[in-house]
C-alpha cells in the first residue's frame, strides 16, 4: 500500500501499538537544554534510574544565557539552570556543549550542524520548535518536561498517530522573497490552527529550490500553523549538507546511509488527509502586524479593519491587537516605524540568514533611533560569519554583533524589548509579552529586518533589488 514519508518514518519506529491507543515510538535523538531538563533529571535521580541511551542524547545551553559577557550570568534562576545542566550531564554521562565549547549554540541550530540531525530519525526536545529538524526528512517534535524524563529513562515515547497534511508550493519566488515569507504567507492564508492534529509535508518546486537553512526556517514555524511537526523529504541538497558532519556517518557508511535515505519519500498514489496549494509566484515579503503569526500581511498592504473579519471572535482579537501593538485599521505597513531590530533565533540565525541580511545593508548605516542586534545561532555560525567578514559589515553599519544564544526571541535572558517599543524580529512568535513586557513584535525575514534597521521603518525589499541582491 502506498505510504507518505510521514507514515514510513512512523511505522519504522513503532515499538508497540494497540487498536485505538497511542503508539509507543522509539526515539533516535533526544536534544536537551537548560530550561526544561532540570526537573526531568531530578526525577531520574529520585527514582534511581539512569539515562537509557546517553549516546542518543545531546545537550547544550541556549535559552537564558547572556549574549554579551556570556560567562557572567547575573540572573539567579538562569545561573542555577545552567549549573544544573552541567552537573546533570556529568552525572548521567550525557554529551554537553557548554559555554566554552565551539559546538555550543541554539539546540535547533547545532543539532543539524553537528550531523546529529539526519533523515529518517525520530527527534524530540523539550522545546516546541523541534520541528526545525524536519527539514532533513526527520520526524521531529517538541515534548513537555515529564516526557523529557520518560525519554531519558526509556528512549521511547507514547504518541497518538497524526493525520497527514501536504502543503505544496510551486512556482518561482520573486527576488527579495525568502523562506520566512513563504511560511508566513501559508499561516496568513490559513490561520494558526489549521495544522492541529497533523504532521505537515512541504512539497513542490519552491521547497526543492531552497537551501537546508531555508528549509529549516519553514519547518521551524510548522508549530505556528498549529501542527505537531513539519518535514521535507530528503534529496541531494540534504545529503550534501550532511556529508562530513561531525556525528554523521563517514565514508562507505555515509554512502550506504544515502541508499536508505533515498527511500524516504512519499510513494506515488499515497494520499494525504488534507492538501493545501499555494502559488509561489504570488508571495510577497511579509510582516506581522498583530499578536499572533496569522496576523500577517504583504509589506505593501494596509492593516485590516474590524469590519474585514467575518467572525466576532476575530474582530475582538483584532481590536485587542490594535491596542496592544499601537497600530490602527487601514494603516500602511510601510508607515510603521520601529525602534529595535533582532536578527537571530532558531528560525533565522544561520549562515544563509546572515548573508541575506548583510547583503542588504553593506555600506549603509542603522537609523539613529534604532538599536539593531545580530545573534548568530551557534558559535560555529559566528566563527564562519567572521571568516567571511560579515561581522564587519554589521558592525560598520551600526549593528551589535553578539555571541550565540536564543537572545531576544523570548524574554528569558538579558535581551529584551522595552515596554511599548517596537521590534522587527526574525524570530517565530509575536505573542503579547514574548520579547518583554509590553514589547511589540513584528515577524519578518532577515532581509526585511535589515532594511527596517536602515530606514527605521518597514520597506519593501523588492524595491532595492537593483542595487542589493538577496542571496
Curated annotation (Swiss-Prot):
A Pfam short name: Aconitase
Catalytic reaction(s) noted: (2R,3S)-3-isopropylmalate = (2S)-2-isopropylmalate
Cofactor(s) the record lists: [4Fe-4S] cluster
EC class (word): lyase
Pathway: Amino-acid biosynthesis; L-leucine biosynthesis; L-leucine from 3-methyl-2-oxobutanoate: step 2/4
Entry note: cofactor: Binds 1 [4Fe-4S] cluster per subunit.
InterPro entries membership: 3-IsopropMal_deHydase_lsu, Acnase/IPM_dHydase_lsu_aba_1/3, Acoase/IPM_deHydtase_lsu_aba, Aconitase_4Fe-4S_BS, Aconitase_4Fe-4S_dom, IPM_dehydratase_rel_enz, IPMI_cat
Binding residues annotated for [4Fe-4S] cluster, in chain numbering: 346, 406, 409
Gene3D superfamilies: Aconitase, domain 3 (3.30.499.10)
Molecular function as annotated in GO: 3-isopropylmalate dehydratase activity; 4 iron, 4 sulfur cluster binding; metal ion binding
EC number(s) reported in the record: 4.2.1.33
Source superkingdom: Bacteria
One Gene Ontology biological process: L-leucine biosynthetic process
Keyword set, alphabetical order: 4Fe-4S, Amino-acid biosynthesis, Branched-chain amino acid biosynthesis, Iron, Iron-sulfur, Leucine biosynthesis, Lyase, Metal-binding
Family designation: Belongs to the aconitase/IPM isomerase family. LeuC type 1 subfamily.
NCBIfam families (UniProt xref): leuC, PRK05478.1, PRK12466.1
Binding partners and assembly: Heterodimer of LeuC and LeuD.
Role summary: Catalyzes the isomerization between 2-isopropylmalate and 3-isopropylmalate, via the formation of 2-isopropylmaleate.
Database matches in PANTHER family: 3-ISOPROPYLMALATE DEHYDRATASE, HOMOACONITASE, MITOCHONDRIAL-RELATED
Name of the protein this chain belongs to: 3-isopropylmalate dehydratase large subunit
Species of origin: Bacillus pumilus (strain SAFR-032)
Amino acid at each position: 500500500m502506498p505510504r507518505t514519508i510521514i507514515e514510513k518514518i512512523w511505522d519504522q519506529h513503532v515499538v508497540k501499538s494497540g487498536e485505538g491507543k497511542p503508539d509507543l515510538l522509539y526515539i533516535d535523538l533526544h536534544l536537551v537544554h537548560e530550561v526544561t531538563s532540570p526537573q526531568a533529571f531530578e526525577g531520574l535521580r529520585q527514582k534511581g534510574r539512569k539515562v537509557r541511551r546517553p549516546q542518543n542524547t545531546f545537550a547544550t545551553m541556549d535559552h537564558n544565557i547572556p549574549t554579551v559577557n556570556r560567562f557572567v550570568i547575573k540572573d539567579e534562576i538562569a545561573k542555577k539552570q545552567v549549573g544544573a545542566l552541567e552537573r546533570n550531564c556529568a552525572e548521567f554521562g550525557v554529551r554537553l556543549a557548554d559555554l566554552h565549547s565551539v559546538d555550543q549554540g541554539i539546540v535547533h541550530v547545532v543539532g543539524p550542524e553537528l550531523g546529529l540531525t539526519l533523515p529518517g530519525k525520530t527527534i524530540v526536545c523539550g522545546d516546541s520548535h523541534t520541528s526545525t529538524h524536519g527539514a532533513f526528512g526527520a520526524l521531529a517534535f517538541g515534548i513537555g518536561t515529564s516526557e523529557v524524563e520518560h525519554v531519558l529513562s526509556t528512549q521511547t515515547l507514547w504518541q497518538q498517530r497524526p493525520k497527514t497534511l501536504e502543503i505544496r508550493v510551486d512556482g518561482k519566488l520573486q527576488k527579495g522573497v525568502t523562506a520566512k515569507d513563504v511560511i508566513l504567507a501559508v499561516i496568513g492564508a490559513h490561520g494558526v490552527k489549521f495544522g492541529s492534529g497533523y504532521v505537515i509535508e512541504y512539497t513542490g518546486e519552491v521547497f526543492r529550490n531552497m537551501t537546508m537553512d531555508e528549509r529549516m526556517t519553514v519547518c521551524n514555524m510548522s508549530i505556528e500553523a498549529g501542527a505537531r511537526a513539519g518535514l521535507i523529504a530528503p534529496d541531494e541538497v540534504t545529503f550534501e549538507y550532511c556529508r562530513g558532519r561531525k556525528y554523521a556517518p563517514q565514508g562507505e557508511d555515509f554512502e550506504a546511509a544515502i541508499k536508505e535515505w533515498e527511500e524516504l519519500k512519499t510513494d506515488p498514489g499515497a494520499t494525504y488527509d488534507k492538501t493545501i496549494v499555494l502559488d509561489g509566484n504570488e508571495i510577497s515579503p511579509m510582516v506581522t502586524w498583530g499578536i499572533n503569526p496569522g496576523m500577517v500581511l504583504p509589506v505593501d498592504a494596509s492593516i485590516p479593519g474590524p469590519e474585514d473579519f467575518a467572525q466576532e471572535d476575530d474582530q475582538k482579537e483584532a481590536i485587542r491587537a490594535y491596542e496592544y501593538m499601537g497600530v490602527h485599521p487601514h494603516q500602511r505597513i510601510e508607515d510603521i516605524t520601529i525602534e529595535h531590530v533582532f536578527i537571530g533565533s532558531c528560525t533565522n540565525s544561520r549562515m544563509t540568514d546572515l548573508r541575506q541580511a548583510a547583503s542588504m545593508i553593506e555600506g549603509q548605516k542603522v537609523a539613529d533611533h534604532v538599536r539593531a542586534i545580530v545573534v548568530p545561532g551557534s558559535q560555529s555560525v559566528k566563527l564562519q560569519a567572521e571568516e567571511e567578514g560579515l561581522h564587519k559589515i554589521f558592525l560598520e553599519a551600526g549593528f551589535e554583533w553578539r555571541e550565540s544564544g536564543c537572545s531576544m526571541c523570548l524574554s528569558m535572558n538579558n535581551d529584551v524589548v522595552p515596554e511599548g517599543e517596537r521590534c522587527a524580529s526574525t524570530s517565530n512568535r509575536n505573542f503579547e509579552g514574548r520579547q518583554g513586557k509590553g514589547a511589540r513584535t513584528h515577524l519578518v525575514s532577515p532581509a526585511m529586518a535589515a532594511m527596517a534597521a536602515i530606514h527605521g521603518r518597514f520597506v519593501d525589499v523588492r524595491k532595492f533589488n537593483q542595487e542589493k541582491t538577496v542571496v
